[in-house]
């Protein structure tokens, strides 16, 4: 079977005299049953998204970090294609489903946030010495925060493999499982042109797009693996979550610069970062990130007991190995945590 959606609005594309963009999009999908418990699927979809009110107009401070408006932000558009195969299986007391899929997504004017320094008087990012002088002569002061902007072009593609099912030991004893692996290649399609442009920068306060010259988008990881196991025996449940992720590929330039410095000498922005983020016992944000931005694995365990049909208790330990890790600068994950939960159903 197949399904195709295509929408067209036959109306005046103006609201209160303001022109509203008209963007038809095509979406198509195909599902085919090849055999018992064997399915092939394919899909293609175009997308068009106008900036939200938050991205375009909001000015707010959250815990000392500001969100700054950008009225020049443009709508993002793109398309996504996916091809997948799902297969059911049964081996004795074991039964489940295996799913394999490949995906490709392309964006134009992709909307992403960028951290930086801002003039609180005019909500403008400080991007040069003249911007800094304008901020100092004004009365608004400065703030650190994020502003949404457009990335010219981005391509994200990869594959996902997952399986889930159950092993029945007997009527009262079961093992449920869910395993998944995702490989993602998050490409900045214009990174060469951007790097060439940034090499011409002469103003020491001019902001670059990200912390390195790589071809990757910010705040992405290539590899993710997750496993969930739940062993049930009558009213008792013993479960475990295991997750493994690869390192973050790039972050914002305001936080650190991973590029090689000429003659190893610090630049003006290095001193700005020292003033903004400080250090503890000689450990700066950059040195901490270099040490902890690595592949990492976490383990959570839980023990649950269903006392009655209406009342259940669960004891959980998150980050069992007390792993210190960080998926982005200034965001250290919680240490080992113990929790007790009671569920009551009325």
PLM feature segments, named:
Residues 48-49, 106-109, 115, 243-286, ...:
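C-terminal beta-signal and adjacent terminal beta-strands/loops
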Residues 93, 101-106, 125-254:
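Gram-negative outer-membrane beta-barrel transporters
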Residues 20-24, 77-81, 155-159, 221-225, ...:
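Residues that define the transmembrane beta-barrel architecture of outer-membrane proteins
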Residues 2-8, 44-50, 57-59, 87-89, ...:
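Transmembrane beta-strands of outer-membrane beta-barrel pores
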Residues 8-17, 66-71, 145-150, 210-215, ...:
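Extracellular loop and loop/strand-boundary signature of outer-membrane beta-barrel proteins
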Residues 33, 39-43, 74-145, 155-157:
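Membrane-embedded beta-barrel scaffold of Gram-negative outer-membrane proteins
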Residues 22, 32-33, 46, 75, ...:
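Residue-level signature of outer-membrane beta-barrel architecture
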Residues 1-14, 21-27, 163-165, 172-181, ...:
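Surface-exposed extracellular loop regions of Gram-negative outer-membrane beta-barrel proteins
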């Amino acid at each position: 079977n197949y399904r195709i959606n295509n929408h067209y609005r036959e109306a005046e594309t103006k609201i209160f005299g303001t022109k509203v963009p008209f963007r038809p999009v095509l979406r198509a999908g195909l599902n085919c049953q090849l055999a018992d418990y064997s399915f092939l699927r394919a899909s293609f979809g175009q997308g068009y998204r106008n900036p939200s009110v938050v991205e375009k107009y909001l000015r707010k401070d959250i815990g000392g970090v500001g969100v700054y408006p950008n009225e020049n932000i443009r709508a993002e558009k793109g398309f996504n294609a996916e091809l997948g195969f799902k297969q059911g299986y049964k081996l004795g007391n074991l039964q489940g489903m295996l799913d394999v899929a490949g995906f490709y997504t392309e964006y134009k004017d992709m909307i992403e946030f960028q951290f930086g320094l801002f003039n609180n008087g005019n909500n403008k990012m400080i991007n040069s010495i003249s911007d800094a002088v304008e901020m100092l002569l004004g009365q608004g002061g400065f703030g650190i925060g994020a502003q949404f902007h457009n990335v010219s072009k981005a391509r994200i593609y990869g594959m996902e493999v997952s399986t889930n099912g159950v092993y029945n030991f007997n009527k009262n004893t079961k093992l449920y499982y869910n395993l998944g692996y995702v490989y993602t290649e998050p490409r900045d399609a214009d990174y060469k042109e951007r790097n060439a442009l940034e090499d011409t920068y002469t103003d020491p306060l001019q902001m670059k797009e990200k912390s390195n010259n790589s071809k990757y988008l910010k705040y992405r990881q290539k590899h993710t693996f997750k496993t969930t196991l739940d062993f049930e025996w009558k009213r008792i449940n013993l479960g475990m979550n295991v997750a493994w992720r690869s390192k973050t590929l790039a972050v914002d330039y305001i936080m650190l610069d991973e590029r090689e410095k000429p003659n190893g000498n610090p630049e003006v922005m290095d001193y700005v970062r020292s003033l903004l983020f400080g250090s503890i016992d000689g450990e700066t944000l950059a040195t901490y990130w270099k040490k902890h931005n690595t592949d990492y694995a976490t383990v959570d365990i839980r023990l649950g007991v269903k006392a009655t049909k209406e009342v259940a208790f669960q004891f959980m330990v998150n980050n069992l190995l007390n792993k210190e890790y960080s998926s982005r600068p200034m965001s250290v994950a919680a240490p080992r945590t113990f929790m007790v939960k009671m569920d009551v159903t009325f």
